[in-house]
Each structure stands twice: as C-alpha cells, then as structure tokens.
C-alpha cells in the first residue's frame, strides 16, 4: 500500500487489497462552462412554448371526446355508419371551435408538472395582459430609462468639451 490509498490491511475484507482506477468515472472538463460570463445573458428570458406540442394536445382533447362519443354509441348498439357519421360531425364541430379560439371552461389555472408548454403559453398571455393593463409599450426594454439618461449625460459632456475647444480656438492664450 502506498500514499494512503486503499485499505490499511486487506485482512477480513474479503479482497486482495489491490486498488484499481475507476475507468467509468468521467472528469468534468470545464467547471464553469454551462454558466455564461456576461451579465446580459443572466437576465431572465421568457420560455417560448412549442406551438406543435400545444396544437397536438388540443387535437388530442378533441379525439378523446370523439372516442367517448364512439364508446357511448357502441354501448347503445347504434349502426356503425351512424357512429362514424356522428363522430365525424363532432370532430368537425370541435376542430372548428378550436380554430376560432373558443375553448370551454375559460383559462386553465392549474397545470400538471409535465405541462411545461401550456404553463409557458399561459405565462406569456398573463404577461401580455399585465403589460396592456399597465400600458407598457410592446417594444419596452428593461433598463431603457437608465440608458437614455446615460446617453443624455454623455452628450452633455461632449457638448461641454466642444464648447471648451471652441473657446480655446477663439481666444488665443495670453502671455
């Protein structure tokens, strides 16, 4: 045994005491790599929902309702052609309502943890309502006031420097 590695003594351990390197261990390459270094990238960015997933979930809800109708009609022993006809009518009606934007039940307040795209979509809509309620312009940039104030101060300093240069050119220095 060397350099305090391994067992002090292999007696009673059921091993030979031979120390091996763990070849499955992967050493991290860059310790700070996933974290950005500039402050602008640390600001919160609104997570954008995937429109395809949201559309798929809405269509899935429609198909669940159609399947419930089909199951109910099959229990009532309705003719297969009639079942297909009614299911198609319901599907067309629900898809038309979905396309018009009319969703039953109003805005959904509670989401399950796996519904991240629905939560992101609801958060964007909530932020938009809040922005309109507070009459904030759509092109508002956070910290824009400070940037404008800094720009005004910078232009005032430049103007003052230019005025001093003008005064220096007009009146020659006296001996």
UniProtKB/Swiss-Prot annotation:
This is Pre-mRNA-splicing factor CWC21. Keywords: Coiled coil, Cytoplasm, mRNA processing, mRNA splicing, Nucleus, Spliceosome. One of its GO terms (biological process) is mRNA processing. It comes from Gibberella zeae (strain ATCC MYA-4620 / CBS 123657 / FGSC 9075 / NRRL 31084 / PH-1) (Wheat head blight fungus). Residues 54-97 form the CWF21 domain. It is found in: Cytoplasm; Nucleus. SMART domains: cwf21. InterPro entries: CWC21, mRNA_splic_Cwf21_dom. Belongs to the CWC21 family. Involved in pre-mRNA splicing. May function at or prior to the first catalytic step of splicing at the catalytic center of the spliceosome. May do so by stabilizing the catalytic center or the position of the RNA substrate.
């Amino acid at each position: 045994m060397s350099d305090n590695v391994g067992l002090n003594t292999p007696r009673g351990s059921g091993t030979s005491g031979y120390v091996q390197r763990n070849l499955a261990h992967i050493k991290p390459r860059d310790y700070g790599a996933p974290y950005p270094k500039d402050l602008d990238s640390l600001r919160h960015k609104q997570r954008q929902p995937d429109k395809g997933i949201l559309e798929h979930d809405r269509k899935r809800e429609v198909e669940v309702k159609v399947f419930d109708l089909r199951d109910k009609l099959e229990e009532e022993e309705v003719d297969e052609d009639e079942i297909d006809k009614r299911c198609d009518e319901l599907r067309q009606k629900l898809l038309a309502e979905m396309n018009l934007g009319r969703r039953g039940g109003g805005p959904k307040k509670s989401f399950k943890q796996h519904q991240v795209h629905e939560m992101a979509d609801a958060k964007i809509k909530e932020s938009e309502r809040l922005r309109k309620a507070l009459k904030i312009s759509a092109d508002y940039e956070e910290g824009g006031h400070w940037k404008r104030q800094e720009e005004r101060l910078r232009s005032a300093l430049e103007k003052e420097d230019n005025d001093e240069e003008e005064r220096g050119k007009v009146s020659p220095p006296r001996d």
